[in-house]
Amino acid sequence: MSYNRLGDPYGDDRDARSPIMNPSSLSNRSPSPGRPLDGYQLSDAPYGHHHHIEMPSSDRLAEQPTYSVERIPQSYGHNEAYEAQHQHYPGYEYSVDPEAHHDAYYTQPYQPTVTPGHDDYDLGQYPGHQHSYQDDEPILQPEDPFQAQNPYSDDYQEDMTIAPTPSPAPLRRWKTVKEVQLFQGNLVLDCPIAPKLLNQIPHAENGQRDEFTHMRYSAATCDPKDFFEERFTLRQKLFAKPRHTELFIVVTMYNEDDFLFARTMVGVFKNIEHMCSRTRSKTWGKDAWKKIVVCVISDGRAKINPRTRAVLAGLGCYQDGIAKQQVNGKDVTAHIYEYTTQVGMELKGNQVHLKPRSGVPVQMIFCLKEKNQKKINSHRWFFQAFGRVLDPNICVLLDAGTQPGKDSIYRLWKAFDVEPMCGGACGEIKVMLDHGKKLFNPLVAGQNFEYKLSNILDKPLESAFGFISVLPGAFSAYRYIALQNDKNGQGPLERYFLGEKMHGANAGIFTANMYLAEDRILCFEIVTKRNCRWLLQYVKSSTGETDVPDQMAEFILQRRRWLNGSFFAAVYAITHFYQLWRSDHSFIRKFMLLIETIYQTINMLFAWFGIGNFFLVFHILTTYLGDADLLGTAGKVLGVVFEWLYLATLVTCFVLSLGNRPGGSNKLYMTMVYLWVFIMIYLAFAAVFVTVRSIQEEVKDGSFTFSTLFTNSTFFSIIVSLGSTYVMWFIASIIFMDPWHMFTCFIQYILLTPTYINVLNIYAFCNTHDITWGTKGDDKAEKLPSANLKPGGKVDVNIPQDDGDLNAQYEAELMKFAQKPPKEIKTISEEERQADYYKGFRSSVVLVWVFCNFALGAVVLSSAGLDRFSDDAEAAETDRNNRAMIYMAVVLWSVAGLSIFKFLGAMWFLVVRMFRGV
């Protein structure tokens, strides 16, 4: 695609200034095999005499043998002359160094000839368009009524917002067939952006071309790992002076709506503005945006939300109608759109509004994957394909919906700048509370407390050791070089990308579950990387806000993946702790990491025995209440009732987890949550009551001292252990100057603790066979046209080209998100509804059957707490034996009676048969 200015770059004296006719003109070219020390600067003399905006020579896009989509009947920048001059090009040994290809990009301009019958449109009806067939004149003329308004003229009226307006006329030429040349078998197009957008942003004038006037489309027909070898490249490497990428930001998304996507992009744009405002920085400053590339990767063309795609089109990063299904018989695996946008965004209510010229430019790459292949595959495109081309310093990972703080990305980058051995870092993930309104939902409040506790206690502890068990994929950063594999192809990325293949029939169930938390594997591999000493750090000043589930069914499904993935990944890390010794860490650091491994092992053991530990604490505390000094008989009755309620709820959890979908049994799951809350209230009452009574007993003796409390086993076991934990939480929160969650969310978290321990853990372990990410299979996307190779190495493409068509298309995209989004209505198919009904009936029958048999055994044996009602142990034992003997006699005589009844019936049958004879 040609990035040279429109028109003849050599003016009238073509032969004298052409790099082919006059080799001396090559003195300003960029390093290449022939001239490794020369710079590269395009001639800046377009047709006619026009005034130019100042543009640094380093920001001029170098010529390249790809094709501009313009309002001319033939492709621009390449023809048979290119083939004649570069016959050797396809066959020589391809260099993996992008700088080696500048010679190929330096070509003479193409002088097109009209192909009869190629374009059936009569341009005579459009004033000023007759010159479209004259390549000696610029396409955009001052007198052209269809041209974009000059934003630098006195008559220009700046419009700070893009308001969708109806198209003033029907489409004139929606799609035109154009013939273009493949470059090294790859289809790459330069597409002009809609004049409606171009009018509102600064750009090169007088027909010149820059990164603001055209969007670059590449149809990738290869696997991500082959992107570089297949000779694909990105815009940053095509400037006269290739740009260095200091910060490479990826936003991965599945089917998030426009609001969630815009929320993330608003945060990213603010961070880029912040770095551009740091004028005293040696790295950043006014042109900091040139060192930052933002990559948006959507997982599946059929999955992307249409409103989100429309927002990308509004930014200039997407155009409908140019993507291809196949190129030269090869299936397209990803559609790559590149554009430097100057359109900002703001959120008003739940709507997205675009604001042109509202901020600094942002270099965007939008990668729309053809198929839904999960998040790890998206990261393969980011690291293996784009990362290898750009060779960035720091990579930042974001999920669509996570909003980084206004300087959070800079804070993450600063951690790497300060600590050379920092291989990865993460910030604080905050729960989006909508100014506190969402705290009225106990589930959200409980998660907010959990997140805060993790950011105050867990992450700082792990950061102090140098190994954070998980850098959340929703907001984290890595040093690109720390991720790279060694010369044998082994390393962090190799282990990380194995997870893409761990969801098929050949994957081991342990490994498949482990890769549900693939970011934990990546963290472990970075710290234990052979002959390296990378560390992981937590950056408290860097924050990112995200939504959390506000419905129990959604919450259970999310935690199923988290718990299973984290558990099996922790087992992997613990059992492979010996890999620490292959790293180049100091002995002290290895010793510290070994201590952290022991700490994580203890944590894992507590998680494994969590259900049993919680029941034992409940049983012991509620049994105390039955003492004569406490509640006496009332305590015994309450203890038995609540113990039966506890066990019944626990069994229900198992039955539902083994066969019922949370979304289809929401009422049953919510009933269990309420029962666990009720049980927790009683447990808290028991703890407080037992503690208060023990203190009262000590005071009553008259010899009470403060040290006496610690000699009281009941007080010491309950208060010192639990109280010190809660007090420690409060003190740590105050020290971190973030104590408000202790006042707004503490009670909700305590009440939901049994739900975390029982419901979530039971569902997770009962569904270890489910290794999906909670997403369904592929939907069939609309089939796209193919680009088939013709004689001469050319293909036909159908593309919108006319200004009116481009504007109408752009306005149509704006209209998609101009209206308020329709209220999302979750529908359940009849098949799912019927299946949920059958499963619910099955579970109800199983529960009734189990509870009836349990009750029978408990009553007969006086077990499950019934034995507490007798104060005389010997009498209780005698009574239990008597009841057992009576039950035994009833059962045995019942069996005998039934057998006799059957025998009599059989005899009667024989008697009747004797008289009937049949």
From Swiss-Prot:
Induction and repression of expression: Expressed moderately during sexual development as well as during the early phase of vegetative growth, but expressed weakly in old vegetative mycelia and in asexual structures. Expression is stimulated by osmostress. Expression is poritively regulated by the transcription factor abaA that binds tightly to all three AREs (AbaA response elements) in the chsC promoter region.
Gene that encodes it:
chsC
Its recorded name reads Chitin synthase C
Q: Which Pfam families match?
A: Chitin_synth_1, Chitin_synth_1N
Q: How does the record say this protein sits in the membrane?
A: Multi-pass membrane protein
Its transmembrane ranges are 562-581, 605-625, 637-657, 672-692, 715-735, 845-865, 890-910
Keyword list (alphabetical) reads: Cell membrane, Cell wall biogenesis/degradation, Glycoprotein, Glycosyltransferase, Membrane, Transferase, Transmembrane, Transmembrane helix
Q: Where is the composition biased (Low complexity)?
A: 22-37
GO biological process terms held by the UniProt record: cell septum assembly; chitin biosynthetic process; conidium formation; division septum site selection; fungal-type cell wall organization; hyphal growth
The protein's matches in SUPFAM superfamilies, at most eight in alphabetical order, are given as:
Nucleotide-diphospho-sugar transferases
Please give the Gene Ontology molecular function terms for this protein: chitin synthase activity
Which family is annotated? Belongs to the chitin synthase family. Class I subfamily.
Natural source organism? Emericella nidulans (strain FGSC A4 / ATCC 38163 / CBS 112.46 / NRRL 194 / M139)
- Tell where it localizes: Cell membrane; Cell septum; Cell tip
